[in-house]
Regions:
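Conserved N-terminal catalytic/coupling substructures associated with nucleotide/phosphate chemistry
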Residues: 1-247, 255-305
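Conserved N-box helix within the HATPase_c
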Residues: 250
Length: 305
């Protein structure tokens, strides 16, 4: 217990184990997909003993889930610390959803009309859009055409307009969004160290006095997280004081990324917590690039672009 002894393998055993391993790995009734290459399986020497080393690379999202047998719901496992644990059906379905290169957020929701979109949100968004793009030809379009240009709406099977998933999330009302995403929930809290006080301020998507969509949530929360960022008095551009610093942009980008990369089919929602000078943002779903690509930067793969 708590130790092991290297017994080693003979050359004959190594050849047999390699043959058995590759035979099993390439049998689609036993393993769904072989993602290993020859260099992943090789004999090495430990001390004076020969052993067979097998390196298992992380599967690309296009290949996940890799599972044992023929049923992904019963044969998909995840390595966690010292053990292999059966993945939940929810996690397996999320892997299948992430295989697509065409973003799922452009899927047309045939069962809805554009009346499920919040007109105040659309109006507010168009005002900001026009301020940022004053000469843009889309500013002259009617709302329906504008939404189609944004890919927030598209023609359904009957030839009429319906929102896309992106359009519903971005412009819809929360009670319509939860018809498609039952666990959709956006939550922002301002907390303090006083345990007797649950929070100093809170807003969430189910309050009912605002839309609860991700655009309005972003607008509400960005003003709250920006407020406490100190701006040096000497922060000027072309002789005029500028009330923004790089930290503002970083915080807003973090919030936008949490909304853009979230798996809204997941079991939990998005939680943003501000406590003094600390800010934590959590969302459902894993990143779709490798850890090395994430730290290297330059390779974005958003779930909901």
């Amino acid at each position: 217990r708590d130790s092991f002894t290297v017994e080693g393998l003979t050359d004959k055993q190594i050849v047999k184990y390699q043959k058995d391993f590759w035979s099993t790995l390439n049998d689609r009734n036993k393993v769904s997909k072989n993602i290993l290459l020859n260099h992943h399986v090789r004999p090495v020497t430990v001390g004076e003993k020969k052993v067979l080393r097998i390196d298992v690379p992380a599967a690309d999202r296009h290949d996940k889930p890799v599972y044992i047998g023929t049923d992904p719901m019963k044969g998909t496992y995840k390595r966690d610390y010292e053990g292999d644990f059966l993945c939940t059906e929810e996690a397996v379905r999320a892997m299948f959803a992430d295989q697509r290169d065409i973003s799922g957020d452009v899927e047309v929701l045939d069962e809805f009309g554009l009346d499920v979109l919040n007109q105040d949100t659309i109006k507010g968004y168009r005002i900001i859009f026009e301020q940022l793009h004053s000469g843009h030809p889309w500013n002259a379009l009617e709302n329906d055409e504008f939404l189609m240009k944004l890919r927030a709406a598209a023609k359904n099977k009957n030839g009429t307009l319906s929102p896309t998933i992106a359009g519903l999330l971005f412009f819809g009302d929360a009670y319509h969004i939860t018809e498609v995403f039952p666990n959709y929930f956006l939550d922002y809290r301002e907390e303090c160290d006083d345990k007797a006080v649950r929070w100093l301020f809170r807003t969430h998507s189910n309050e009912g006095d605002w839309s609860g969509n991700i655009y309005d949530f972003f607008c509400k929360v960005r003003t709250r997280i920006d407020d406490d960022v100190a701006v040096p008095f000497a922060n000027r551009r072309n002789g005029y004081r500028v009330d923004r610093v790089d930290v503002h942009d970083a915080l807003e980008e973090a919030l936008a990324n949490a909304l853009a990369h979230a798996n809204y089919y997941g079991r939990r929602g998005i939680l943003v917590v501000k406590n003094g000078k600390e800010l934590s943002i959590s969302n459902p779903g894993t990143i779709r690039v490798t850890k090395e690509e994430f730290y290297a930067g330059g390779n974005s793969d958003p779930r909901n672009p």
